[in-house]
């Protein structure tokens, strides 16, 4: 595997982007960041109040995500929703060697996870909005999809990802 992989762990709220991203980064021996920390205060306030972000809200944030990936030395795994293809294209414009990991799960599983999560600014009420916005990763995009329903543990997801990503990041 490439010793400096650039990986975006993507999906809707509750998919486990941060948890899986941290575990994957540890397995690969690279740094982990959460793109939520790059949101401007106005985006955080908007989401915390139950309002969905617009594309205009997201584009400056995605530019920061892409810049962080482009500047990374030694590899980086970053958790970022990257719900639409145009968002992923914005990231790829800044960091073309980025690979995406799409954490896909049933609405029932995702809702359960969101409702049991504490201390996050994203309310469960926005899950439907995110699912409506989601454009799943396509075969023409650089990355892989993992079903959370088929892989119920973090270890199972990470093991599967390492196996799937190895040929892509070498």
Feature roles, as predicted:
Residues 6:
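Walker A (P-loop) ATP-phosphate-binding motif of ABC ATPase nucleotide-binding domains
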Residues 9:
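Hydrophobic anchor at the beta1->P-loop junction of P-loop NTPases
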Residues 12:
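P-loop (Walker A) phosphate-binding loop of NTP-binding proteins
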Residues 22-67:
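Conserved substrate/cofactor phosphate-moiety recognition/catalytic segment
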Residues 73-76, 98-99:
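Loop/turn-to-beta-strand initiation segments
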Residues 94-114:
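Conserved phosphate-donor/acceptor-positioning beta-strand/loop module used by diverse small-molecule
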């Amino acid at each position: 595997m490439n010793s400096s992989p650039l990986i975006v762990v993507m999906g809707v709220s509750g998919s486990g982007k941060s948890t899986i991203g941290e575990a994957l980064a540890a397995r690969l021996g690279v740094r982990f960041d959460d793109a939520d920390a790059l949101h401007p205060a106005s985006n955080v306030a908007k989401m915390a109040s139950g309002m969905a972000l617009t594309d205009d809200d997201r584009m400056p944030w995605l530019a920061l995500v892409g810049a962080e990936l482009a500047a990374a030395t030694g590899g980086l795994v970053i958790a970022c929703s990257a719900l639409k293809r145009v968002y992923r294209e914005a990231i790829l414009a800044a960091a073309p060697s980025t690979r995406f990991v799409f954490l896909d799960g049933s609405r029932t599983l995702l809702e359960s996870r969101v409702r049991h999560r504490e201390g996050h600014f994203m309310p469960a009420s926005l899950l439907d909005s995110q699912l409506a916005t989601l454009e799943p990763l396509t075969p023409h995009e650089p990355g892989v999809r993992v079903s959370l329903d088929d892989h119920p543990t973090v270890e199972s997801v990470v093991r599967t990802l390492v196996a799937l990503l190895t040929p892509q990041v070498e």
